[in-house]
């Protein structure tokens, strides 16, 4: 009988502890109910220059003016939606005290137009869609990571910077003097560009794909990164591909390429008047040239060229090859 009582008391204690832990875990979790409700709040001002979106929220900036913000969210989540303006930063997120897990959230925040933005940042699967055209201002920097997404209609600024990482995505149209874009860790940047100078980096399976026109492009791809710019017409181009990185270009005046360690560069749409190609360690360059070509291939590197160019300088060694196709 005593043993039976001990076992019963032990089981009761285990059940009580399990229930206690379950209750505590439920408090630390927030799961959207699917029942969407709405409310409208008013911003302190609408002249912030930095916007940060986090925790899976969907933010839409529309053409409306004023300071009113509409929030559509699950009825058990809407009270935890934060739209907080501190100094020059507007933060939009979901924040429940002591909560460590958020799932199945349905949160849409609609903002009025604000052309004062100089910095946009999205994290943790948040998304931002900017509908208005921004036709004034000097700079705009966009940073996205952790599966977040930014889509812009049209941005016109002197300088535009984009940094995407960890499966994040950026899409849009940009008119600027200078564009710098970097994609890493399976992130993707896809944009239409009209710029004087474009600088691109792609690494760790990141991808940058651009179309449009530029005076000068500088591109670097490494560690299986991809720069796809065959639909971006460029007067001058400099490209370097290493460690299985891939670059496609379209340069019609001057082209300078270097490919090593199985890097791959292709520029065959337009014929560059002057071209330089250097390959080594299994690197590959394929180009179109109508004027003079300086080519150097070593250690199993391959250069293939077409067009009416003449070889001003040609060097091969250690299994490197230079061939016309």
Residue ranges and their predicted role:
Residues 1-325:
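Intrinsically disordered, low-complexity terminal regions
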């Amino acid at each position: 009988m005593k043993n039976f009582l001990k076992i019963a008391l032990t089981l009761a204690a285990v059940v009580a502890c399990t229930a206690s832990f379950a209750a505590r875990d439920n408090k630390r979790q927030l799961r959207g109910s699917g029942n969407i409700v709405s409310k409208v709040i008013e911003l302190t001002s609408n002249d912030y220059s930095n916007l940060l979106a986090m925790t899976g929220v969907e933010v839409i900036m529309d053409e409306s003016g004023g300071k009113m913000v509409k929030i559509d969210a699950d009825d058990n989540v809407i009270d935890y939606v934060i739209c907080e303006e501190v100094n020059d930063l507007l933060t939009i997120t979901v924040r429940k005290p002591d909560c460590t897990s958020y799932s199945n959230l349905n949160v849409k925040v609609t903002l009025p137009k604000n052309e004062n933005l100089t910095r946009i940042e999205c994290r943790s699967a948040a998304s931002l869609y900017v509908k208005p055209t921004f036709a004034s201002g000097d700079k705009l920097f966009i940073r996205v990571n952790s599966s977040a997404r930014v889509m812009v209609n049209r941005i016109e600024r002197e300088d535009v910077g984009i940094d995407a990482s960890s499966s994040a995505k950026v899409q849009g149209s940009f008119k600027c003097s200078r564009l710098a874009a970097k994609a890493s860790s399976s992130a993707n940047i896809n944009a239409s560009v009209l710029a004087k100078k474009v600088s691109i980096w792609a690494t760790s399976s990141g991808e940058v794909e651009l179309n449009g026109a530029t005076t000068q492009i500088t591109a670097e791809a490494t560690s299986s990164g991809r720069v796809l710019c065959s639909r971006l017409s460029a007067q001058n181009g400099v490209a370097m591909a290493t460690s299985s990185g891939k670059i496609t270009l379209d340069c019609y005046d001057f082209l300078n390429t270097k490919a090593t360690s199985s890097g791959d560069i292709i520029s065959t749409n337009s014929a560059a008047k002057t071209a330089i190609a250097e390959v080594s360690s299994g690197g590959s360059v394929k180009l179109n040239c109508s004027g003079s070509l300086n080519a150097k291939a070593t250690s199993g590197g391959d250069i293939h060229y077409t067009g009416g160019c003449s070889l001003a300088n040609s060097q091969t060694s250690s299994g490197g090859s230079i061939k016309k196709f």
